[in-house]
Amino acid sequence: MEIKKEKDEELSKARHSLAHILAKALMQLYPETKLTIGPAIDDGFYYDIDLPHSITADEYDKIEKKMKEIINKGEPFTRKVVSRDEALKLFAGNEYKTEIINELPKDEEVSLYYTGDDFYDLCRGPHVDSAKRLQNYGFKIHSVNGAYWRGDEKNKMLQRVYCYAFKTKKDLADHIAMLEEAKKRDNRKLGKELKLFMISPEGPGFPFYLPNGMIVRNLLIDYWRELHRQAGYKEIMTPIMLNRHLWEVSGHWDHYKENMYLSVIDDETYAIKPMNCPGGVLVYKSEPHSYKELPLRLGELGIVHRYEKSGELGGLLRVRSFTQDDAHIFMMPSQIKDEIKGVVALIDKVYKVFNLDYFVELSTRPENSMGSDEDWELATKGLKDALDELNLDYIINEGDGAFYGPKIDFHLKDSLGRTWQCGTIQLDFQLPQRFELEYVGEDGQKHRPIMIHRVIYGAIDRFIGILIENFAGAFPLWLAPEQVRVLSLTERNNDYAETVSYTHLRAHETRRH
């Protein structure tokens, strides 16, 4: 059943208003500040500023004190609309604001928000009506980091002032306590302590698995293989690098090239695959198919590479090279619902093994997409109907689908209450059409199959990172790299301890130390 996506509009509006309060405080404390942008985000807000000196942690209290002074004055937030030319005059001397204004149509009016009478900023709103409404909110500056103007490394490096903001001071304290606990569980910290993986300066974002990490990884893979064998999947493996022409046909070249690693071989451009699906399509296309073979479920533990900015990398949770537990299902239109139900059941079974709760989102057509309106409507309806028949609650996530089709996303909840998007089911009418895939139907005629893309772990590497933090390194016994440690209390017990370890435990394939 579709449920309304819960968004706390009041909190979002307050965070946005607090960003303006921060900007006003910074201008009062550091008049040479040039303001750029300052949006609300999931746990608070930030403001990017151009300031000659670097703000240090010693200055946080001073800035917060100034913010509280402004709030306690109870100044109103008021909107004013001005012409483009007037806005350019108001922000003369601030090249960041004037750049934004100059991108607007010449006849477009510009929205400003005033905080009191002496501070204004470019903004569409909305905001609280008065700063008084922010008096009970808990907020705290937690960091100042570098950020390129508009995220472009060719532009000037700015300072991004991050703040947490919550409805009450208790909510703020609870959030900070959760983050402190999360630091103790950080996959980078525990990965090193437990000798699971390492990241080398010679390969940022490319994880090295150590012996203990390989045990966890291989156990997850073994479980995946057995589960999929029982569910009627066949495993394939496709090349890691393929010709540019393939990516042009698939649409990745137009929609995903900026995330791809390229190379030239024999004067031809090749790309290291960022996704496994075109390879799976080529496997299907390599021979004729009858309707009697469908659905054809092809699984692949494929290594993919995607470019991520260095500042966004984080242990196993954000990497540039990872293994996706992919599967591509080729089917007839009449099989859509049953196949989606089967995949949902498989995903549910896996998450229950790890005692992980989840919620479901149905992500719809993004702006940067390919295919006809009719195909997108059919695909979206197919996913929605399957979820409704399963009586699953789900949230509509507008505009967050893949460029080739809508998708069902599964968001895991960990022991700290954080959520992680892992599993996904994508229904695709586009790739079968672009690659001219066919099967011979019961009527003896050629028909176009429909394709499902799906993952359960998402990326095995990221899933391991989530498990490390969820279990704080104390994996379930079946997954633990070290299941038993034999200790000898005195020297005279050494021989017996070795007998227990090497004879009894090894005979039962127990992982011991």
Q: PLM ranges: what are they?
A:
Residues 472-473, 478-481, 485-493:
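Glycine- and Gly-Pro-enriched alpha-helical subdomains that act as flexible
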Residues 267-269, 278-287, 296, 300, ...:
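A translation/RNA-centric and nucleic-acid-associated enzymatic feature enriched
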Residues 503-510:
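Conserved small/polar residues in nucleotide/adenosyl-binding loops
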Residues 1-13, 25, 34-37, 46-308, ...:
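Auxiliary tRNA-acceptor-end handling modules of aminoacyl-tRNA synthetases
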Residues 43-54, 158-163, 201-211, 323-333, ...:
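Short, hydrophobic beta-strand segments
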